[in-house]
Amino acid sequence: LEDGAMCVALSSGTSAIMYSLINIMSQGDNFISANQLYGGTYTMFDNILPEYGINAKKVDITNLEAVEESIDEKTRAIFCETITNPGLVVADISALSDIAHSKGIPLIVDATFTTSAIQKSFDYGADIVVYSLTKWMSGHGRVIAGAVIEKGGFEWGNGNFPLFDKPDTSYGGMRWGHDLGDLSNVAYSLRLRTVPLRNLGANMSPDTAFEVMSGLETLALRME
């Protein structure tokens, strides 16, 4: 639905956001975050990630100058929501993408509120899209689920992501940003599937997958 290159389905939107960040960040790193976010995301960024040495630098996402000025050598991504919940602030994804790409970092967009039925964030320059599938995508309120979708083509071996440069001792010395050959287009998703998901285990259950697929059948109609 997003016209992405690869998707990793997870057990919740919260795990999707967490995995999307820790896949490219470690202790001492930071990312730029919108200062208006869904409450659960705000709590994660304020209270959980700092315990692991990862810090969210919150800025007014509509102030593009402030966004750019907040980026430093330890910044690994820009994170925003398509439309904030509940503040209804609309992110200028194209402009944020331009800033991110000028610094060699990705734009991660939480598209839960709009879904791909209203807006395809990749068309505006997003590199990673995350979802809580619990809400509009599923639509029936019967499951909790999430997803991380990669557009494909971002250069993860550009020197800005140490986790993609150093050999992964848990996976035969693989350097995710350099050793994948024809699969380098989806290096981010392959690492997310193999490292955070494999080792932390927030996988989607088969029953949940069935419910989500059933919900997707009526997504476009419901989003009208």
Task: Provide a role label for each language-model segment.
Residues L1:
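Glycine-rich phosphate-binding segment of PLP-dependent enzymes
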Residues M6-E224:
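Conserved PLP-enzyme active-site core in the AAT-like
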